[in-house]
């Protein structure tokens, strides 16, 4: 079905990513690739100066370690960590890497989502490829 599947995972995820990876295994072609992606939120310079010098590097390394644990044991599965803003970074990454399916986890929408919009909602609205939403 799909040749290149993207699974965005929050660096601080407490949800089990197994459901997303299991779905990817079902909908993938035999030679397709799965990419687990974490976005470390960009910290503006006026805030970053209050953090330890190596904080962003530490955040990226920690995210890579968590993603690698999730990816272990799955064929043609790679990981990537980028710094940016979640929804925009997911959409840009999908476009640049010719992703044809995004599997995104979502929570039940709350009152604030109607004003702010969740990452999943923004990805669904603006993606140029198929999007599967897991609850």
PLM feature spans:
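Small/aliphatic-rich secondary-structure junction motif
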Residues: 3-50
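General small-molecule cofactor/ligand-binding pocket signal
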Residues: 35-37, 78-82, 132
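Short secondary-structure boundary segments
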Residues: 38-40, 105-107, 135
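A short acidic, glycine-rich active-site loop
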Residues: 53-65
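Short beta->alpha linker loops
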Residues: 62, 81-85, 135
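Structural beta-alpha unit
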Residues: 71-102, 109
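Glycine-rich, Arg-bearing micro-motifs that act as flexible, cationic patches
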Residues: 104-126
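Short, flexible loop segments at boundaries between secondary-structure elements
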Residues: 126-135
């Amino acid at each position: 079905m799909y040749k290149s599947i993207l699974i965005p995972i929050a660096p601080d995820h407490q949800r089990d990513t197994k459901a997303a990876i299991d779905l990817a295994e079902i909908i993938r072609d035999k030679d397709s690739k799965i990419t687990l992606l974490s976005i470390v939120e960009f910290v503006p310079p006026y805030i970053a100066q209050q953090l330890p010098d190596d904080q962003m590097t530490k955040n990226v390394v920690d995210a890579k370690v968590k993603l690698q644990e999730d990816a272990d044991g799955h064929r043609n599965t790679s990981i990537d960590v980028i710094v940016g803003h979640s929804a925009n970074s997911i959409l840009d990454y999908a476009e640049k890497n010719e992703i044809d399916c995004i599997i995104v986890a979502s929570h039940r929408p709350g009152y604030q989502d109607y004003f702010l919009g969740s990452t999943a909602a923004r990805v669904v609205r603006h993606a140029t490829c198929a999007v599967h939403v897991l609850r």
